[in-house]
């Protein structure tokens, strides 16, 4: 897709469709649309009245030009209330735009971002959000369908005020990379467990390393055992597909900081001997979403090149029932010497993360961020669309939460309540891998992970169990993997000083 930034008049646009936006508070057409209305002999005003187009959120007015203009269609999309408009509303409008052009089979179109300048953001940020919404909204995973979606965008033009043009050109490049990297993550998550095994996940990391010049280390079962990662190995024992520990490194010339990113990498989770019921096992291919997000972030930073050293760490495994599987009541020693009593083999992700957090702590980074589809309890607490954020450093938590508000990847803080620490105490080991209460499960999981992080290192845990994958589709996320939280964490890395 070719993307151009323009500041010319809409009436001169040489595309198949011009798309503009109208808020509910707008009493009349914008001057640019009024110009087009005159050229079309009042057709826009007439259809606006006839179809009672009032700028309501998501309402669409399609006006054919019948050869009277340089384009085939003028399209108005309702933006709802100005008071509620933000950058994520812009992404949603980008999504509605591309869904509309797809229905009309339009492959060259212009989106007028100027009416959106009432949002308290620069038009460069607005242009970036438009591009993200278009690319994310146009995503589909049709690799295994006999009949594929043939729609492709050849050219997207975005119109901004002339003074924002240079900045918008740069921000649009960033938005394109972020959205395409998020789609890359979606692609891997959407692949089934018979395609993406731990070895295949390691191969993808190696492919990224070759493409962007990263360092990469892949450790096999024997090497993992030598490193003392017994919690991680316990989870992997029941599978015919061997585990792979992945360490991928982006190292700029003069890094300002060192950041470690950890992604939960269960390529499939059956629950192990505490096997999941059939309905709960469905979609467990998405239990690798955190790992895939780390790989997507590396795809982005390989192009955007932030001034921070970044370590991506993935303990890739498959949790399956077998004669070799770990059992309830087993006691396992993690890499840092902490002993873990197994209460349930379906609480396996925190075991793989435990050893990954120990490994990351030994690197002495300035911060550790882990991303994991960890608990159903987080989905119960916050719903399907919001991630839970917790950790040992309020400043780091606040930084990530602030960025998530701009990226539209919704997150909410969860408190480390000292009373809940009592519920991960085990009778015969240092810690239980499940809480002894049915309440606060997302937090007790976070408190478990805390035991494997060096207390001197700022650390944040993001439970993405809700928003990482969806079964219905919402806004610019089609059914399936969302690629959460690639844009938030990449933006965090770009903003480090």
UniProtKB/Swiss-Prot annotation:
Mn(2+) 2 binds at residues 264, 269, 287, 348. One of its GO terms (molecular function) is metalloaminopeptidase activity. It is found in: Cytoplasm. Its main location: cytoplasm. Keywords: Aminopeptidase, Cytoplasm, Hydrolase, Manganese, Metal-binding, Protease. The keyword Membrane does not apply. Its cofactor is Mn(2+). It catalyses: Release of an N-terminal amino acid, Xaa-|-Yaa-, in which Xaa is preferably Leu, but may be other amino acids including Pro although not Arg or Lys, and Yaa may be Pro. Amino acid amides and methyl esters are also readily hydrolyzed, but rates on arylamides are exceedingly low; Release of an N-terminal amino acid, preferentially leucine, but not glutamic or aspartic acids. Binds 2 manganese ions per subunit. Pfam families: Peptidase_M17, Peptidase_M17_N. It is an enzyme of class 3 (hydrolase). One of its GO terms (biological process) is proteolysis. Its EC number is 3.4.11.1, 3.4.11.10. SUPFAM superfamilies: Macro domain-like, Zn-dependent exopeptidases. Mn(2+) 1 binds at residues 269, 346, 348. Presumably involved in the processing and regular turnover of intracellular proteins. Catalyzes the removal of unsubstituted N-terminal amino acids from various peptides. PANTHER family: CYTOSOL AMINOPEPTIDASE, LEUCINE AMINOPEPTIDASE-RELATED. This is Probable cytosol aminopeptidase. It comes from Persephonella marina (strain DSM 14350 / EX-H1). The lineage of its organism: Bacteria, Pseudomonadati, Aquificota, Aquificia, Aquificales.
């Amino acid at each position: 897709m070719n993307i151009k930034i323009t500041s010319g008049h809409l009436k001169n646009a040489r595309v198949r469709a011009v798309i503009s936006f109208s808020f509910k508070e707008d009493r009349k057409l914008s001057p640019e649309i009024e110009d087009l209305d005159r050229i079309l002999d009042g057709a826009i005003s007439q259809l606006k009245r006839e179809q009672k187009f009032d700028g309501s959120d998501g309402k669409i007015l399609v006006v054919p030009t019948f050869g009277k203009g340089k384009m085939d269609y003028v399209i108005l999309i309702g933006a709802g209330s100005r008071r509620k408009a933000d950058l994520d509303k812009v992404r949603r409008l980008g999504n509605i735009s591309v869904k509309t052009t797809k229905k009309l089979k339009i492959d060259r179109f212009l989106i007028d971002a100027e009416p959106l300048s009432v949002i308290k953001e620069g038009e460069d940020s607005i242009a970036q959000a438009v591009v993200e919404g278009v690319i994310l909204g146009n995503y589909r995973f049709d690799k295994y369908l006999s009949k594929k979606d043939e729609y492709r965008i050849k050219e997207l033009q975005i119109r901004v005020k002339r003074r924002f043009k240079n900045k918008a050109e740069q921000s649009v490049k960033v938005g394109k990379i972020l959205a395409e990297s998020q789609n890359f993550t979606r692609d891997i998550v959407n692949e089934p467990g018979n395609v993406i095994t731990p070895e295949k996940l390691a191969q993808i990391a190696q492919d990224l390393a070759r493409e962007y010049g990263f360092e990469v280390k892949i450790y096999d079962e024997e090497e993992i055992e030598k490193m003392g990662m017994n919690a991680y190995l316990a989870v992997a024992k029941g599978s015919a597909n061997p585990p792979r520990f992945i360490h991928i490194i982006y190292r700029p010339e003069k890094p300002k900081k060192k950041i470690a990113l950890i992604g939960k990498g269960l390529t499939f989770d059956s629950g192990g001997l505490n096997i999941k019921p059939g309905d709960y096992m469905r979609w467990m291919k998405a239990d690798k979403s955190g790992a895939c997000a780390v790989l997507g972030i590396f795809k982005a930073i390989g192009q955007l090149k932030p001034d921070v050293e970044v370590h991506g760490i993935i303990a890739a495994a498959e949790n399956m029932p077998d004669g070799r599987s770990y059992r309830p009541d087993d006691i396992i020693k993690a890499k840092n010497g902490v002993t873990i009593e197994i209460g349930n083999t379906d609480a396996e992700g925190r075991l793989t993360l435990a050893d990954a957090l120990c490994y990351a702590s030994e690197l002495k980074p300035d911060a550790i961020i882990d991303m994991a589809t960890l608990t159903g309890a987080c989905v119960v607490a916050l719903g399907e669309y919001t991630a839970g954020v917790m950790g040992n450093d309020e400043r780091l938590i606040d930084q990530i939460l602030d960025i998530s508000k701009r990226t539209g990847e919704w997150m909410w803080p969860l408190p480390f309540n000292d009373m809940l620490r009592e519920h991960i105490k085990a009778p015969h080991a240092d810690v239980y891998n499940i809480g002894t209460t049915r309440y606060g499960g997302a937090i007790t999981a976070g408190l478990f992970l805390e035991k494997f992080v060096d207390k001197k290192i700022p650390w944040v845990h993001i439970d993405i169990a809700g928003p990482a994958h969806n079964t219905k589709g919402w806004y610019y996320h089609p059914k399936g993997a969302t690629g959460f939280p690639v844009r938030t964490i990449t933006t965090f890395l770009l903003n480090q000083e």
